[in-house]
Amino acid sequence: MEISRVEALSQHIVQPYAWGDAVWHVWGASQGVEQSLEGQTMVAASNASKQPLVLLHGGSGSWTHWLRNVEHLAKNRTIWALDIPGFGDSDLPSGLSDADGLVPYMAEILTHTFSGDAVDVMGFSFGGMTAGLVAAQYPNLIRQLILVGAPGLGLFGKELPMRGMTPDMDEEAQRKVHRHNLNAMMFVHPDSVTDDVIDLQQANVARDRLRRRRIARTDVLAQAQTRWQCPVHGVWGACDALYQGTLSQVPQVLSSMATFTVVPDAGHWVMFERPDAFHGVVDPLLSR
């Protein structure tokens, strides 16, 4: 399976904190990443010329949201894909319920991992909103931020026809719900929802313990931009279901963005549905 192949190319890093473990997958570190017994992560000196890029996944996700991108991006960067606390294999801090509560934990992880140095961050959807809040409260930690289909702008279009699970559903019925929801929210083309994608979605949703999405429907990210000190870029799919009828308003609401690019023929999960076109947009940004 593609997930197993791509994961096998990575280095798996588990960092212990007082609240639990944070889990990274790292690609492109030519001599690997060293980790002390205390969990301190140290980037090998030989990689100093290959700048790190932190990838933050979307809601109900994990590093696998970047499955079709990490190999390409690792050609020029050391890729650090985090399972955000409460998702994937990372632990959920006690009492945490939404993205705003994540900010100090994310700041702790970035500070610990990169010794307080500012790094480039690319965040998809929920991960982009979270990164934007970190950039506002801890501007010294992020050198450049790329937002991909981020919520928190107060621009949600019509309500999506999402379906829920019920206790009596068998495996086949659950997969039908996942297929429906992926088509409704994540993709513009039904043939993008393969059996492997449903497997990926099932595995990610099962590990989502941060179930609240309260602030995603507010304008919290738009409000945060007044405190950004780094360059911020936006990349959206032209057919993003979260922005039906409102996509054209994004650059006005996020007026502090340095650039805003719309990828044609792509849904919300733009970097998965149209990876080549997505790379064509972000590669020049990451060369800066």
Per-segment meaning from a language model:
Residues E172-C230:
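Conserved alpha/beta-hydrolase catalytic His-Asp/Glu region
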